[in-house]
């Protein structure tokens, strides 16, 4: 009985540790993702040009650029 309880406790602890590791952000970058150089500025994302099909134009509310 004692051995069974110990196994259950170990199983629960390992599940809790795995869930905590999954939820917390990783301190180390994943090897599959390329890391930007330290001196490199972040890329500037330009808004997509918006093509209005219906009125009122949704571009006015979202702040996109009209063509």
From Swiss-Prot:
Region annotated Disordered, chain positions: 22-44
Keyword Signal: yes
Keyword Metal-binding: no
Keywords: Antibiotic, Antimicrobial, Disulfide bond, Immunity, Signal
Disulfide bonds: 50-59, 52-57
Changes after translation: Disulfide bonds are important for activity especially against Gram-negative bacteria, since the linearization of the peptide causes a strong decrease of activity on these bacteria.
Coiled-coil region: none
Signal peptide: 1-25
GO biological process: defense response to bacterium; immune system process
Feature: compositional bias, Pro residues: 31-44
Tissue: Mainly expressed in hemocytes. No or very low expression in heart, gills, inestines, and epidermis.
Subunit-structure text: Interacts with chitin through the N-terminal region (26-48). This interaction may be important, since chitin is a component of the fungal cell wall, as well as of the crab exoskeleton (permitting a possible action of arasin in wound healing in case of lesions).
Role summary: Antimicrobial peptide that has a large activity spectrum with activity against Gram-positive, Gram-negative bacteria, as well as against fungi. Shows activity at micromolar concentrations. Displays minimal inhibitory concentration (MIC) values lower than minimal bactericidal concentrations (MBC). May have a dual mode of action depending on the peptide concentrations. At MIC concentrations, the peptide penetrates into the cytoplasm of target cells (tested on the Gram-negative E.coli). The two inner membrane proteins YgdD and SbmA may be required for this uptake.
Protein name, entry field: Arasin 2
Record organism: Hyas araneus (Atlantic lyre crab)
């Amino acid at each position: 009985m004692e051995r069974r309880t110990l196994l259950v406790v170990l199983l629960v602890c390992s599940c809790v540790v795995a869930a905590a590791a999954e939820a917390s952000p990783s301190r180390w970058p994943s090897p599959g993702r390329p890391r930007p150089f330290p001196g490199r500025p972040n890329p500037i994302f330009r808004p997509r040009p918006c093509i209005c099909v219906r009125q009122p134009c949704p571009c006015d509310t979202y702040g996109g650029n009209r063509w």
